[in-house]
From Swiss-Prot:
Enzyme Commission code: 2.8.1.4
Protein's name in the database: tRNA sulfurtransferase
Primary localization class, coarse: cytoplasm
Source organism of this protein record: Aeromonas hydrophila subsp. hydrophila (strain ATCC 7966 / DSM 30187 / BCRC 13018 / CCUG 14551 / JCM 1027 / KCTC 2358 / NCIMB 9240 / NCTC 8049)
Residues in Rhodanese domain copies: 404-482
GO cellular component: cytosol
SMART domains listed in its UniProt record: THUMP
Active site per the UniProt annotation: 456 (cysteine persulfide intermediate)
Pathway membership: Cofactor biosynthesis; thiamine diphosphate biosynthesis
The organism's place on the tree of life at top rank: Bacteria
Catalytic activity: [ThiI sulfur-carrier protein]-S-sulfanyl-L-cysteine + a uridine in tRNA + 2 reduced [2Fe-2S]-[ferredoxin] + ATP + H(+) = [ThiI sulfur-carrier protein]-L-cysteine + a 4-thiouridine in tRNA + 2 oxidized [2Fe-2S]-[ferredoxin] + AMP + diphosphate; [ThiS sulfur-carrier protein]-C-terminal Gly-Gly-AMP + S-sulfanyl-L-cysteinyl-[cysteine desulfurase] + AH2 = [ThiS sulfur-carrier protein]-C-terminal-Gly-aminoethanethioate + L-cysteinyl-[cysteine desulfurase] + A + AMP + 2 H(+)
Source organism phylogeny: Bacteria, Pseudomonadati, Pseudomonadota, Gammaproteobacteria, Aeromonadales
Disulfide bond sites: 344-456
Length: 482
């Protein structure tokens, strides 16, 4: 298999040195991602494109899925590559590939060249198009809106016949910009905000302030792992979990009710800045949107920002909620967010919408900052690549099996799209489909005399859900890995 990678246009207009650096970074990113499943993948750098090749055609679908999610790629062409001698040879090769597919259809030929040739791109289009029109049973040439568009790329002595064009993610290659630390809660906003900076070329590390116990942390890890695994797996990033319950308890006891929301956000920014300093990260990212909740007025955001010199980036600051939800659906975090509890907004009954810095600072004089220092010092740092391994260790008491028994039901917990695309069929066994985001509420209604085997494609989600169900007191659960 072979693909031609078309660069995001902003890369191509950079100066020569910057463009070459960005392309080289993208080359490494693609190589890192593809070699997670295909050791034979090769990535060759050219002036305005990259060429990906592998002898392992069985990984074609995985490669297409991976390339579509790598920042910096505008589009990628699936091609058949060969050498050619002259125009007629090009025609013969194109006819062998496309001839049978033109029956009863209009078509046109589009060619792009790079290098020195005795013919122009237009001459290629005319010669190949005219030859196909004469030798194939088609409905003729139509230059505008044809039924079939045949794309050719000629680079030196190489001919690339394009069989499919796939849309890329666009954006900048990861690591062309500086690192950021995203304050992730698992909700709609923070996941989308994190994605925006992945797409813009930043390594996005994650900082989670735990207000809801182990189940909440498991859910947020799922979101962070999903974002990394789908869009950012070319680079190592960290997931930091900070137990913020002692901080909330201190706020509830010492801070005036109306000021609690702003004070809590200021404490989070202080803690996040300390975490960022630990890893020399210059900026923080939040999913805040102006006016969405009481703490997100311009006045309050200004007061919140005063606690740190770090740049606080808010990519969703003007987004409407329906647009955020739509983007969450597109990037695959919607289903996580729909079942994620929100804790931050419930601690103030009458929150201020116009905080005064002097009053906030006066309230904070009652706060014991040793508590904040302690929770940051005790924060847990995790290489996000190890989330799956850590989960496996945490659920070691949950049996993993490749077989199913007579009194066992296989539960396919993948999303609806994944289930519909590749339904799980096990001969002679009952298979039920309950998406992971409905499992928490639906599991208690299932017959308790049966044992349920949780299945997902990679085994990470099933292990996380098994741990959660175990914590809820359900013993009749296993992980299914056929």
């Amino acid at each position: 298999m072979k693909f031609i990678i078309k660069l995001f246009p902003e890369i191509t207009i950079k100066s020569k040195s910057v463009r070459q650096r960005f392309i080289k970074i993208l080359q490494g990113n693609i190589r890192n991602v593809l070699r997670r499943f295909d050791d034979d993948a090769r990535v060759r750098m050219d002036w305005d494109k990259l060429i990906v090749s592998s002898r392992n055609d069985q990984f074609r679908e995985q490669a297409i899925e991976a390339l579509a999610c790598i920042p910096g790629i505008q589009a990628f062409l699936e091609v058949q590559a060969s050498k050619f001698t002259d125009l007629h040879d090009i025609f013969e090769q194109v006819k062998a590939v496309w001839g049978d597919q033109l029956e009863g259809k209009t078509f046109c030929v589009r060619a792009k060249r790079h290098g020195k040739h005795e013919f122009s791109s237009l001459e290629v289009e005319r010669y190949v198009g005219g030859g196909l029109n004469q030798h194939c049973v088609s409905n003729g040439v139509r230059l505008k809106n044809p039924d079939v568009k045949i794309n050719l790329e000629i680079d030196g002595e190489e001919l690339f016949i394009v069989s499919a064009i796939h849309q890329g993610l666009s954006g900048m290659p990861i690591a062309t910009q500086e690192d950021v630390l995203s304050l992730i809660s698992g909700g709609f906003d923070s996941g989308v905000a994190s994605f925006q900076f992945i797409k813009r070329g930043c390594r996005v590390h994650y900082c989670f302030f735990n207000l809801g116990g182990a189940a909440h942390e498991i859910g947020v890890k799922q979101v962070a792992y999903h974002l990394w695994n789908r869009f950012g797996s070319s680079h190592r990033v960290r997931f930091t979990a900070v137990d913020f319950e002692p901080v909330v308890a201190e706020i509830l006891e010492k801070i005036d009710n109306g000021q609690m929301g702003v004070v809590l956000k200021r404490m989070m920014m202080r803690a996040a800045a300390k975490v960022a300093d630990e890893f020399q990260i210059p900026a923080l990212v939040t999913g805040e949107c102006v006016g969405q909740v009481s703490s997100q007025t311009l006045t309050n955001l200004n007061v919140i920002d005063r606690v740190t010199d770090k740049v606080i980036l808010r990519p969703l600051i003007t987004w409407d909620k329906p647009d955020i939800i739509s983007e969450a659906r597109r990037i695959g975090t919607l289903e996580f967010a729909e079942t994620m509890p929100e804790y931050c907004g419930v601690i103030s009954k009458k929150p201020t919408v116009k905080a005064e810095l002097s009053r906030i600072e006066a309230e904070e004089e009652n706060f014991d900052f040793a508590i904040l220092d302690k929770v940051v010092a005790e924060a847990r740092y995790l290489d996000i690549r190890r989330i799956g391994e850590e989960t496996a260790a945490e659920v070691q008491e949950v049996e993993t099996t490749a077989e199913s028994g007579d009194n066992e039901v296989i539960l396919d917990i993948r999303s609806m799209d994944e289930h519909n695309e590749k339904p799980l069929l096990v001969e002679g066994r009952e298979v039920m489909h309950i998406p992971f985001f409905k499992l928490t509420t639906a599991f208690g209604d299932l017959p308790k005399e049966k044992t349920y085997l949780l299945y997902c494609d990679r085994g990470v989600m099933s292990k996380l859900q098994a741990l959660y169900l175990k914590e809820k007191g359900f013993a009749n659960v296993k992980v299914y890995r056929p």
